[in-house]
Amino acid sequence: MTPSSVTLNCSNCSHVLAPELNTVKAVVLGMVLGIFILFGVIGNILVILSVVCHRHLQTVTYYFIVNLAVADLLLSSTVLPFSAIFEILDRWVFGRVFCNIWAAVDVLCCTASIMSLCVISVDRYIGVSYPLRYPAIMTKRRALLAVMLLWVLSVIISIGPLFGWKEPAPEDETVCKITEEPGYAIFSAVGSFYLPLAIILAMYCRVYVVAQKESRGLKEGQKIEKSDSEQVILRMHRGNTTVSEDEALRSRTHFALRLLKFSREKKAAKTLGIVVGCFVLCWLPFFLVLPIGSIFPAYRPSDTVFKITFWLGYFNSCINPIIYLCSNQEFKKAFQSLLGVHCLRMTPRAHHHHLSVGQSQTQGHSLTISLDSKGAPCRLSPSSSVALSRTPSSRDSREWRVFSGGPINSGPGPTEAGRAKVAKLCNKSLHRTCCCILRARTPTQDPAPLGDLPTIKIHQLSLSEKGESV
């Protein structure tokens, strides 16, 4: 009996005979897609755990990245396994009802992932354009509202076919595909891709323009600072400080903070720019093929081309963790920490003691330091001074150093401060926080000349009273 006779004899049957399964092809395809899915699940879980387990990554920007990872994880764990089985068997075996649910969840996760990139691009624009005001503009409450709105819009776009906005379902239940009804195809393509893409491109064009302008301004500022002095002095005085000294302090500190903050925002924008570039390359073919095939059936591409563009879009959800790992040193260290089964909530205690420094509520402008290891208080006296200095050979903000020019008084004894390796300096009046490496001096020493002061290497800088790292 030939295949044509099988088709002829079954032309009036309610079910078409299942094609014979190619075992070798199924095994190879299953292994490839299985690795693909496993990589997406593990990679996005690592991204989420990196932020959860590392406090210095718990910022608004990384919360948006976590939301992106959640959307990609849902896609990798709830949609891709059934898509892979569909590809391996070359037919749908889970029934019509589950087919409709699977297609809706597919659109939901993909739309949420794309809109997360849109929100991230807006966040990066604000971070680069207004680096010093960013913590006040992009608060955690506003970030939560943005994430909630993102998911609400994704649900609205994805549930249309569940309420009948689709073409009639085929009689054969082994056929399952996303809706190609022209109206919904255009609506979903515009809402899920083209509108977010327009916002993303507009934001990153603005980021590029602002970054170029800001870089030129900071270079000019660096030249002026260098010709005037290689030091930016931050002094903590009593309440009778003159207005002129305070204004000069604020002006010079503003430049240092602006330089450090902008450098970090620019790096984050570059990393997420790579993410957006990969997103466009992965999703653009599918969102070109889908509406064209729906509106002009004569130009509909073959099933093979459609499947390739479909899985290329899926591939985007699996490569984002790779991008973070390759282009973001903080994520790289966090991944290494997680793979070493070591969840860091704070700075490692093996060779660093973390100190938090806050302004005393009862001692005027003095700063109180408390050691996390033993809680022993240390205090910088009101006459102490701290200086930010850039080495002449430095080319970026990572070469800025901090000098402490005043005595550090320790409660239990001088050895407590001597063992401290990591410190956080806080001054609410200027809204700055520095986490640095400190080479301590004994409390009895007189303030040394500026050139002989101990060096402190900056690890983090924060512009908020709560010490949110930037």
UniProtKB/Swiss-Prot annotation:
Residue positions with a glycan: N9, N12
Bias (Polar residues) ranges: 381-392
InterPro entries associated with the record: ADR_fam (IPR002233), GPCR_Rhodpsn (IPR000276), GPCR_Rhodpsn_7TM (IPR017452)
Membrane topology, from the record: Multi-pass membrane protein
Membrane-spanning segments: 28-51, 65-88, 100-122, 144-167, 182-205, 272-295, 304-327
SS bond partners: C99-C176
Protein name: Alpha-1A adrenergic receptor
Provenance organism: Oryzias latipes
Classification lineage: Eukaryota, Metazoa, Chordata, Craniata, Vertebrata
